[in-house]
Amino acid sequence: MPLEFGIHAASQIGRATGKPDDPAAIDRLVRDLQGAGSFVVREYLHFLGEPADPEKARLLRPADRLRALTMPDHWYADGRHLDLVLCYQPEEPDIAGWLSFIDEVIARYGHLVRYLQITLEPNFPIEWIDGSSPGILEALIRGVPHARRALAAAGYHDVALGFSVAEPAEWLGGDEPFWAALAAVPPAEFAEHIDYIGLALYPDAFSPVPADAVADLIRHGITHLRETCLPQAHLTATTPIHLCENGTPTAPDRTPAEQAARLETMIRTIASCAKSANITVYELFGLRDPVSANPEPLTQLGITTDDYTPKPAYATYRTLIGELGAR
């Protein structure tokens, strides 16, 4: 089953920030990766509420991002599809503000968006991720149908709507209460509005994992989501999974060649599961390191260094897109 491939092309990752993004370099590299097919580009917008956390406001620049993304509007042509993630991270619950934010985003970017994701990993309660934000379940459960109505009112009937999770649960200490909460929501109020589920898988990015264990961890994460979690939320096998975030870093104990080999294992494993698990989209995280000299995993997830010099994983990804991608 061919996959639609894509990438997170900007380099801001939570607190990890480095040199400013270079739109010309992004354009050159994405065009090279894309080839003649379609290609997904993932971007993030943040609702921080009032008053916003000062550090998040400084690094994430939500007002600036609501005006302009990393690349200009006209760039989203020639088969490039915008996957826009709306993150909910206020200091206090603010559902009214969140719903207004969704409306603002649709008014500004609805004409560009192909995939609209409501919340980022609401099952994952760590800082800088939506699962740690007060009111997150209500933000998800009310945000999805609100976005559907807003899209329909604006005439954007081709936008696919979803949310993402990080799985499997044992990597996170368990997320049973999250899925139980979705199980309690009548399908007409939530599940029937969902066009896809995003899955973030980083089996070897944040803990030591031998290379020969990576494929099994990928398969387990996909199977756990499809067979254990989604049925609880009234989401059937006909609802596609997007591998919306996946990557493996270079590190002091992982060479660029090893990064490339692990990435190939991950992508080939995901592709082998695509038909049985109904996986339709794969997005790599990400294009460029925020800070290549920093040994932290988040700062070296790129397939290019922080000056856009390709690592071996860049050529690997390009080859896999040509081999496994939808044309």
What residue ranges belong to the model's regions?
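Aromatic-lined substrate-binding rim segments of carbohydrate-active enzymes
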Residues: 26-109, 132-164, 211-218, 235-236
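Aromatic-rich peripheral "rim/lid" segments of glycoside hydrolase catalytic domains that contact
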Residues: 4-32, 55-60, 75, 122-126, ...
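Hydrophobic faces of well-ordered beta-strands that scaffold small-molecule active sites
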Residues: 3-9, 39-43, 80-86, 114-118, ...
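Substrate-binding cleft/loops of secretory-pathway carbohydrate-active enzymes
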Residues: 96, 167-198, 254, 258, ...
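Glycoside hydrolase catalytic-domain groove-lining segments
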Residues: 29, 59-65, 155, 187, ...
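Active-site groove signature of glycoside hydrolases
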Residues: 104-135, 160-169, 201-203, 242-246, ...
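Short, acidic/polar
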Residues: 16-33, 94-107, 173-187, 260-272
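Aromatic-lined carbohydrate-recognition surfaces of secreted/lumenal glycan-active proteins
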Residues: 8, 87, 136-180, 230-251, ...
